[in-house]
Amino acid sequence: MSDAPLFGKYRAVVINNIDPLQIGRIQVMVPDVGAVIPTSWAMPCVPTAGINAGFFSVPIIGAGVWVEFERGDPDYPIWVGCYWGSAAEVPVLAHAVPPGVPGITLQTPLKNGLTISDVPGPTGGILMQTTTGAMISVSDVGITISNGKGAIITMTGPTVDVNVGALTVI
């Protein structure tokens, strides 16, 4: 350990996210600690973990992460979360939830995602969407399933509609 303990959070950038142990560790560059030397493997700090249970997500290379050091020792880094460097980095699906409305967005870099929103009506609820446009939407209005290529099933009230009126069951 260096002479002075390193307490607090430090901005860092992911340089390696392929953990040989597959436990969510990453290697980062922490400019305020050692500008050109990558850290040893930074352990993840996750909201929940246990045997065959927990939250697992690893940031992509180049992502901004917050790093702390166990007992202030730079040989024991912990990545405790991530940050966006600009508005352009925020997941596109997050913009479907208006500011001030409770919502949760999970999205991969290729835009496969899940949005849960408290927006009332047809635009709220739960939306799962793939990169190619296939989606499942569950809202107060009903449920819509689309393959992104034209096939659509809509369930509203007691009605099931297939392909915009090609078959309707009441």
Give the positions of each predicted feature.
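Hydrophobic packing positions characteristic
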Residues: 1-155, 170
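Short, low-complexity, Pro/Ser/Thr/Gly-rich segments in the mature regions of secreted, periplasmic
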Residues: 165-169
